[in-house]
């Protein structure tokens, strides 16, 4: 099928290439001329901007958006809403908030434009291994998009999750679980460092990927990371969060659904960014006040 592709970052470029290798016709655009040139060398038709991309597509058009969530996605979808016609389809494959996706679907529907929110997992290795795709939207839109989804995903690697917003909702929870898994692995391997045993962390992680009940792709990546840099030399103890973990925690509060493990994993990331924790210094001082406990001085 013919598909317009907006956004050629780390994942977007890989997805465009996978579509090309699967025999699809891709018209691509990005703010980076270098990124557009790179996929054009592999067979994509370059477009200078969104207007040029839409003009190059045959109706009914399908445009896949793969840009950062928030303002970038809002801007691109708004422009596409003005350029596209009834029967065209917009796919948001980024990590948008599911509430935004529901709103965008409703706004585009008023113009007769279809919308699919496609939660995408697979990272930079998805080009070769395929991408897991969680897709919300009308059945007609999903059916039309199915050839591209089948190419992008590994066997049985995509699912119509329900109406608009459901794809990004499922991806949000997916990422919340990812936070918790990563934190559990990190805590376990930190315990190894204090065990008194001279353990090879990379070999243990690799071992656990073979038949263990805690095996996962994340653990495979951890084994590779520890093999390359066993002590994580030069890696700062600063852990960013990209938004979905926060949204998962907020949703759990709004729904009154306990999610203590995911919440703790998110809070651990916040703590990692504090060079000097006020709360820890508060506790240190308070113990001295009520019990005369020794205060460990800074520096």
PLM features: residue spans?
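Rossmann-like NAD(P)-binding element
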Residues: 31, 44-103, 109, 127-137
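NAD(P)+-binding Rossmann beta1-loop-alpha1 motif at the extreme N-terminus of oxidoreductases
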Residues: 1-61, 87, 124-127, 157, ...
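Anion (oxyanion) recognition and catalysis
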Residues: 20, 40, 102, 109, ...
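Hydrophobic beta-strand scaffold residues
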Residues: 26, 46, 114-116, 259
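Alpha-helical transmembrane segments and their immediate juxtamembrane flanks
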Residues: 293-299
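Rossmann-fold dinucleotide-binding core
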Residues: 76, 97-186, 192-195
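Helical "substrate-binding/catalytic lid" subdomain
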Residues: 134, 144, 165-293
């Amino acid at each position: 099928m013919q598909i317009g592709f907006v956004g050629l970052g780390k994942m977007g470029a890989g997805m465009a290439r996978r579509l090309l290798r699967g025999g699809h016709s891709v018209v691509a655009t990005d703010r980076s001329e270098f990124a557009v040139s790179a996929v054009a060398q592999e067979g994509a038709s370059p477009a200078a901007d969104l207007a040029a991309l839409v003009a190059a597509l045959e109706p009914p058009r399908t445009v896949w958006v793969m840009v950062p969530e928030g303002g970038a996605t809002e801007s691109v979808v708004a422009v596409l809403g003005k350029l596209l016609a009834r029967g065209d389809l917009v796919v948001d494959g980024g990590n948008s908030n599911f509430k935004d996706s529901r709103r965008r679907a409703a706004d585009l529907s008023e113009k007769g434009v279809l919308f699919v929110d496609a939660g995408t997992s697979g990272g930079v290795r998805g080009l070769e291994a395929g991408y897991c795709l969680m897709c919300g939207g009308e059945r007609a839109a999903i059916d039309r998009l199915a050839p591209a989804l089948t190419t992008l995903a590994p066997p049985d690697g995509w699912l119509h999750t329900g109406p608009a917003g459901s794809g990004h909702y499922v991806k949000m929870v997916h990422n919340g679980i990812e936070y918790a898994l990563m934190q559990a692995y990190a805590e376990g391997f930190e315990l190894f460092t204090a065990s008194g045993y001279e353990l090879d962390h990379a070999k243990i992680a690799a071992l656990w990927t073979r038949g263990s009940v805690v095996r996962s792709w994340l653990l495979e990546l951890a084994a590779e990371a520890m093999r390359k840099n066993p002590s994580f030399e030069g890696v700062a103890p600063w852990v960013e969060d990209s938004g979905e973990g926060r949204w998962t925690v907020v949703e759990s509060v709004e729904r009154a659904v306990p999610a203590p493990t995911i919440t703790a994993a998110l809070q651990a990331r916040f703590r990692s960014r504090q060079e000097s924790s006020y709360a820890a210094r508060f506790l240190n001082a308070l113990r001295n006040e009520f019990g005369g406990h020794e205060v460990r001085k800074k520096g």
